[in-house]
Amino acid sequence: EQVWPGGLVVEVKCPFRGGQPAPHVKVLPRMMPQLQGQLLATGAATLHLVSWSPYGSTVFRVTADLDYQREMGEALALVARQATGDGEELGRLSRAVRERSVVLAKRSERVALIPPSECVSVYDGPCAVG
């Protein structure tokens, strides 16, 4: 709370796509359930997603969306009750969560682009990145 009003969560991803490490250029909708779940679990209002690579990094701001978190909770509750056979309602909620994930991913804001730099290690010996 003293560092960031409303609390702050930091999630770090190290993407390795196509055999090459490269930072994300945007927040992907498929990340949204995890990111919003972290915000819900911690009660924080903001999450900074750091996408790191040895060639540079990006930082994105993701804000909590209580409606989305509620829909996720409803979908999870339906999965838990799946034996009751309410697949139609689960399908509706699943589609709603996927659609909202796209909206929230687009709303996420890139707050920093960090250029590559020399590897700095607090450990003795060579740097692990090379």
What are the functions of these language-model segments?
Residues E1-G130:
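Accessory terminal regions of nucleic-acid processing enzymes
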